[in-house]
Every structure is written in C-alpha cells, then in structure tokens.
Amino acid sequence: MNRKWIDRLTAGLVLLWALGLYLATVAPTVSFWDPGERIASAYTLQVMHPPGAPFYLLLGRLFSMLAPSAETVAWMVNLLSVLASAGTVLLTHLIIVRLVRRWQGDRSEQTTGQYVISLTSGVVGAVAFSVSDSFWFNAGIAEVYALSTFFTALVVWLILRWSDLARTEEAKLGSGRHFFQLDANRYLVVIAFLFGMAIGVHLLSLLAFFFVALIVFFTEFDKEAWSTQERWLRIVGAGALSSAIFFAIYPGIIVGLPKLFQAVGSPFITALVIVLVLSYGIYKTHQRRMGLANLAFMCVTVIFIGYASYALVFVRSATDPPIDMNDPDTIEEFISYLEREQYGDTPLLQGVTYDDATGRVNQRNGESTLFPRRHSVDPQHWNVYERYDSDLEFFLDYQIGYMYVRYFLWNFSGRASDVQGADWITGIPGLDQHADLPTLQTPSEKESRNVYFALPLLLGLFGAFYHFGRDWRRAFSVFVLFFITGIGIVLYLNQSPMQPRERHYSYVGSFFAFSLWIGIGAGGILQMVYDALRDAASNTTQMASLLGTGLLVFIAVPGWMALENYGDHDRSENYVPRDYAHNMLNSTEENGVLFTNGDNDTYPLWYLQSVEGVRQDVRVVNLSLLNTKWYARQLKNEAAYASAPLPISMSEDQI
C-alpha cells in the first residue's frame, strides 16, 4: 500500500478512536460549574460571564439548532467539545509524526523502519493525550477549553507545515532571500485568522503565538554560521519582538480597539476608517510588491475579522436577555467586561503584599514591592499567607507546586482521588509517602484513584531529552510552548489560596506540549531498538522487534492510562446536575424567588429555565452577584422569562 494512504489510514484510526471514546463518555445533559451557563447562553445567544466567548457561543448555537428537542440541546452543545477534542487528538498525532520525520531526513530516503517509528510515535503520543486526566475532563462537557486546545493544536500543526513548505519552495527558487514572497505564507495568514477567532473562544490559544514566532525564526532567519552566543542573543531578540507583537494583540487590539471607539465617540465611523486603511494598505503593498508590509496588513486584517465576533456581546446585551452578565451594552461597560473588572485587579510585577509583622495586606498604606504573590485583601487568605515566610516561598510551594506541578503529575504520574485538594501519586510502594491518601470505600470513590506508575512522566522526560539531542530548535520551541502554557499562566494569574475548585483544566496546553514528548519518547525507544538491530538482524526481525516494542510501550502508557481513567471520566449516565436543578425549581412556590450563591446552584437552574423551559415563573437570584450595580438593576427593572421584576425599594441612584 502507498505510504501516503497508510499515513491517512493511521490518522483516520486515531481520529475514530478519539471520537468513539468521547461519544461513549460524553455528558448526556448539563454538568456542574460553567456548562449550564454556556449552554443557556449558546441556545439563545445571551451574555455570559466576562470576558465572554462569543465565537464559541455562535458555534454552540449552531449545534443547538440541530437538536431534535429541548432536552437534547445540552448533548448537542456537549458534542461541540467532543468533535473539537477528537480533532485535537488527530492533530497531536500529525504533529508528532512531523516532528519525528524532521530529523529522519528526506522522506524519499526514509527506510521502512523509520517510517514505522514515526507512525508509532504519533499514535502513542496522541492516544496518551486523548486519555489524560485534564484533557478528557474537558472533552465531554460544554466548555471552551476543548475548542481552545483545538485552536492551539491547529496553529502548531499549521506552522510546522508552513515551515516544511517554505523550505521546499525556497529550495526551488534558489539562492537569495525570498521569505516575504513565498506562497507558503498564506499559512501565516490563516494562523493569524485562527488567532482572531480564538479570541472569541479563550485567550489561552494566543499563547501558541510564541511557538509560531520561534518556528518562523528558526526556519527563515537562523544561520549555521552564527556562534552559540550570537544565536541566543538573536533568539532573545526574537522573543522580545514576538512579545511586543503579542501584547499588541492583547491587550492592544482586544481592549485597545473599544477604547479607541470610546475616545473617538463614533464606533461606526472609527471601524469604517480602520477597514479603509487596512484595505488600502493591502492593495498598495501588493501593488508595490512590499512583501513584509503586505503580510503584516493581511495578518492584522484577518485578526480584526476574527475578533469581530465580539460584536455579538454588544448587540445581544442591548436586547436585555435574562442572562446579561455585566450588561455590556455601552462602550464603557463593554471595556469593563473585556477587562474583567468584576473580578478586581491582580498585581503582576509590582504591588502591595502580605506584611508578616502586621499579619495583613494593607492596600492604603502598604509599601509596594516587586513580584507580589501574597496580595489578596481577603482576611481568610491571610490565615494561609502566615504559613509562608516570604512571597517567593508562597510562589514556589503553592502557586507552582500546588496549582501546577500537582496537576501536571495528576496527568502523567497518578491521582490520589477526585476529592478537592487530592495529591499526586505514582502507585509505587514507598514513593507515595508524601501523599495524604484518603480511604476510598464506594465504587465511584475507588474509580477516582488513578495510578500510572509515573510511566507517562518518564517517557515524556526521555522524549524531551531525546528531542533536544535530535532537533534542539524544535525541541526548544516545544519547551517554550510547554512553559508558557504552564508556568507562564501561573505567573500571570497570581492566584490566591482557597480556590473554589481545581484549576487543572487551564493548563491543558502545557499537557498537550508534554504529550508531544511522550510520542517522541516512544519514537526514541524504537529508534534505539532499530539501531541495535539494523546490521545484525533481517528486515523481518527488525519489523517484528519494532512492532512488538511499540505495542509494549502502547500498552504500558496510553493503554494503561485509558483503563485507569475510564471509570471516573465516563459521564454518560450522570444526570445529577440536571436532576438537582429540576428539584430545586420544582420545590419553589409559584412565582417564587429562589436565592442561590455559587456557580453550581445557579448555572444548572439557568439552563433548565432557558433551554428546557422548566419553571420560568421562578426568579433565580444569585447572592454573589448582588454586590454589583448592574445585577441589582436587572432584578429591579427587568423581567426574566415568566417572572416579574423584583419589588426592590432602592432607587436607581441608591443602587
């Protein structure tokens, strides 16, 4: 069979594996936390909590329109995550295969053994990622993270494909600098458009920009004649330039554009001028064959086009839907919505911090310090801060150790249970003495303890070292993606203690990058077997040894992960959130007011009222939102479904 067809068949089998797995385990209805709000908002295009996800809502609305009944709307919106996750697994396979074949040389000279190694690497890495704890968690519910990870993987695959096509095209053109005139650069425009659309899903996808920048640098600007010092100085310079471009997108375009509209006072005229300037720039730079400028104008234009999905927030808020978080129907409120002002400011590089002498954080008289980590003014958090001697200790122990490394090891070493605060484990006697292992009694509790004997971790670490030894440039690019989507997020979020839920789902981009190394690690093992047998055994023995070793690695890592994780990741019979919300609403008197407090006792109710039309006469009041003026005004002035406004005696000015 032609190798191209074998490639396609293998990729198709990986896709079918992921699709079948997620269809078998997808939630049949609403889940706890944000999915209730996501589904309700997608069904009638309402405004969910800041900074919103308008492009996700548009896709969710499309899927909901295909539902045969109101009761199946939730499953259809969940299906969006299923398809996005299956697509991500396919892309993971393709990326690993491309990375491995990069150092194997010209494909025309690739031996059968090398071909088997590259395909097996992709299968092992992709399947391992498909059954990893956090990614599988996102794959079966109506959440933005599955689609966001798909955008990340798609951008990574596209830039690697661009790199290969650009080198092939340059080789045909001969000597000289042709970069800005390459036909392959259309891939860069597509990537820019994907970044624009990803803004309307989740900003996490934008972090792949640094991977893109490094691949472009190593493909077009790196020179073998450079010394090590010269090369790293230029890498730092490229990093600084890419950081400047990144911040030009966020917050430059994302927040800066609405602020420009506000400053000018006429959004329509301002938008029209921007469109005309960009159109003229594209035309003139193309006419004058100004390659770099034309590429820049094209990329900026498609980013704006992708970002345009945010007009949905502004337009829909003006209709005052029942779910209208922050009421962003004016430019001023829209900017506040984008900047997440509802959640307060978090210092990044400089600000006040916890004073060990006074035992508190004093915002008024406290001295500003560099790299403040213990910054929360909540007195409950001070009781946690006092356990740490410094901000650095809190950063290393809690923010990195507890809020990232623990999640990382959940995915690639093992997880003690599904109880909040559960530790990581290995399952190896004598190595888990650090962990507080709860007694697990019920079947569901026992299913929640997953042990992998740290085999995925070891295989990924080996893959990282092997990758650096074979192709340090792309290995470094993967490392930057791994770091930025992991520790980089930790640095930026500057999280306070006592988080209301586990946040492992935020770091799936980092776990995706590590899964690439799991696949490469499998390829490294197979390559060592192949090298050992190349001159000493027949082709039949070589192939049998490669396939046998590959099968053992597959069973030991992704196979075992799948067996361990299936039980507690199977949501196919989980109706608890919907039943809970149904009981809450139906226990309320006619035209009653039902007070809730958090996400889990609010969002499933919103879903039932908005989508399934259950007890729309009940007014759900979220107490945690009552301290915001926009929510109090909505309760006072606006009806919600069949419930009347509340008789709030406070005047508009008092609110």
Regions found by a protein language model. Give the residues of each.
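Short hydrophobic/aromatic helix or loop-helix immediately within or flanking a transmembrane segment
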Residues: 42-72, 82-83, 90, 433
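Alpha-helical transmembrane segments
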Residues: 7-21, 123-127, 190, 236-244
